[in-house]
Amino acid sequence: TKQENKDTVMDKDIAVITTKFGDIKLEFFDDIAPKHVESFKLHAQNGYYDGTTFHRVIPGFMIQGGDPLTKSEDKSRHGTGGNAAKFFGIGSEDSESTWDLPAEFSTTTHTRGILSMARSQNPDSGGSQFFICVADANFLDNQYTVFGKVVSGMEVVDAIVSAPRDARDNPDDRI
């Protein structure tokens, strides 16, 4: 049976990602990355993340999710989709698919349990994809926007990162 992820904002500061391995509870850093937090919360509230999967799992590094294209069984496009939940000045205001988040770098380090925004080579290209560090990754500091942390469920993150995966680090089964 397929297990779909469903992200639900419980209150102002906590979100829950439900997976077949259990729940991951996230706390947000509104003070250091307000636009990233706002975009993530809006996506969670409007169902954007419902049915998405963790499409990239790298042991000793991180798990990545938040791509709306992972709702499809076609893995070839997994990891290529997603945009900001509203217009933050990057992209074309009348074309939602082009909306990106401006970088909000801080002194917060990428340690185990940190929630950060995935992006392309362009620092101002964050959209909806996020990752959770399973180990310290200080080489990402000041290059990727940290916007929260896991407050409960790191054992779930550890189970996800250990899942069998293909050559593209996409889990064999939907998570």
Task: Go through the PLM ranges and name each one.
Residues 1-175:
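Cyclophilin-like peptidyl-prolyl cis-trans isomerases
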